Amino acid sequence: MLLEKKYKGYSLFAYDNFFIEIGKNIIDKEYKELNIFKNTKRNYVSEIQINNISYIFKEPRNECIIPQRKFFTLFKKGEALTTLINVNQAISEDNLTEYAKPFLAIVKRKNGMICYSAFIQEKINIETDRNLDKMIEITKKIHSKGYYHGDRNPSNFITSKDEIKILDTQAKKMGFGNYRAHYDILTMKMDSYQDMRYPYKKNIFYYLALSVKKFKKLKFIEKIKEKKKKLREKGWKI
């Protein structure tokens, strides 16, 4: 059962009271930061240690700084809590143990909108061999259970001889058709695995996903995205 605890203006969510207490440690800054993997306007990701146990800590910042996304958090759980709930359900109900397990979500709201969120998940101690074919197979497995990744690039997968782990996903369910499945696979094929043998039948959803991918790669669209990125780095909230 999902637990919720209020603490110093924050809402802590976990499936075990142990991680509620870990959340209090994080809010009180009672942890050691071992490595910072990413620190941008969009995300903060680091390895932290509490009571000699290491975790991956992530702050998804986009929903707090981009006005339209922040507004819609009035009606949504937010990325941290969604990740906690969805991934744990996928692991327990569909036996998708390849997902890196999240333990805790921290959410703070102001005027009903999220102004801060974070979550922690297990630290994966595997040296990846970056096996692209294994990544395709595990992606097909989550698609067969009705889930999609949403950011299907090799850095979000850890592969080894005996184990595969999936990172950085909210484990959302696909809607009507398999558009999201095609989009996941096309992302990898176009960006990092051009020689891939395409694993799905090319139906109407394939061509829709392909059209969207090609549109996003148009030069003027990429220039707009790059301009927005630079403005965000300067503090613009767009």
Spans of features found by a protein language model:
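Juxta-kinase regulatory segment immediately upstream of eukaryotic protein kinase catalytic domains
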Residues: 1-35, 227-237
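ATP-binding glycine-rich loop module of kinase domains
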Residues: 33-37, 41-83
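Active-site ExK catalytic segment of metal-dependent nucleases
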Residues: 56-63, 122-124, 168-170
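Conserved structural core of kinase catalytic domains
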Residues: 76-81, 91, 97-135
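Protein kinase catalytic-loop region centered on the HRD/HxD motif
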Residues: 141-147
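Catalytic-loop of the protein kinase fold
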Residues: 147-154
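C-lobe/activation-segment region of protein kinase-like
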Residues: 148, 163-238
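Hydrophobic residue at the +6 position relative to the catalytic HRD Asp in the kinase catalytic loop
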Residues: 155-159
